[in-house]
Amino acid sequence: MILSEMVIRSKLIPPQPNQTIFHRGRLKDQLSKSYDYPLTLIHAGTGFGKTTALIELNGYYNRVHWYHITEPDRDPTLFLAHLISAFLPGTEYLLTRLEEGGISATRSVLNGLINHITTDLEEEAILVLDDYHLVSDVTEINRWLEQLVEHRPPYLHFAIGCRQIPDTPAFIRWRVKGMVLTITQVDL
């Protein structure tokens, strides 16, 4: 399997904002606070505007790395391949390493991605993970996200859109530490 051909590039492009978006002042105020938090969590049921809020959040950052998660991304290798590809160009070698080493190479590949992000990003940036609820019960993916958040450079922020708060020790710890800006359906 050639991983670069398994990556659907359109999932890595932020959707275009709808021209009829209703902008709520309070929501804009909350979104503008995302700079103060490593992680912004937008959770609400279907149809409440999570993706729309994530699109609006993009406007606060010069560099946006987007990943729209779909059901097939429950495969950890495919998930990691998309995550790596969200930071192209410059991460092609990590796809090759993942392809050659398989799932056993994920630790070194993830470390390589963290190092790439740390040296490549020189300004505030955001990684958006839209529809994270589709993979939130995959232990390996949660561990990778935990490693990324724990070792991120200070100018990289994460935004996660999901239907419920992920029930993992890392999310609980981050919320207790005040690392998470939480936006709910009441705010949307």
Question: Which residues fall in each region the model found?
Answer:
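P-loop NTPase Walker A phosphate-binding motif
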Residues: 40-68, 81-85
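A short beta-strand-to-loop transition that corresponds to the Sensor-1 phosphate-sensing loop
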Residues: 44-46, 131, 160-165
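Conserved P-loop NTPase "ATPase switch" module shared by AAA+ and STAND
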Residues: 116-141
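Conserved adenine-nucleotide phosphate-binding loops and their immediately adjacent elements
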Residues: 1-31, 93-97
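Alpha-helical sensor/transducer elements of the RecA-like P-loop NTPase core
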Residues: 26-27, 52-56, 139-188
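A short hydrophobic beta-strand->loop->alpha-helix junction that borders the nucleotide-binding pocket
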Residues: 43-44, 65-75, 82, 99-103, ...
